[in-house]
Amino acid sequence: MVKIGKLQFMWKDANSRTGNCPGLHRVTDGTEGYVVVGKSTDPGVRAMIAEIGDDETAVFVPANVLDRLRGQ
């Protein structure tokens, strides 16, 4: 489990109108990184990922959530 002290909301799925939507947060506690919020995937997706740890998970987010990072 990764411990994170502070997050800064960056943006959400461009097609979302309300809460409960995929989004991206920047870690702002001195650790460089991001937290991605997305929909849980089914076990079949997890099985397709070659290397995934027992303490890791796979989530789906629309491409527009992460594509915006290129413009940063």
Where are the regions that the model predicts?
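C-terminal structural segments of small proteins and small subunits
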Residues: A47-Q72
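Short, charged/polar N-terminal "headpieces" of proteins
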Residues: M1-T18
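Pocket-edge structural micro-motifs
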Residues: W11, V37-G38, A63
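A short, structured beta-strand/loop element
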Residues: S16-E56
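Acidic/proline-rich low-complexity IDRs
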Residues: K6, G23, V65-R68
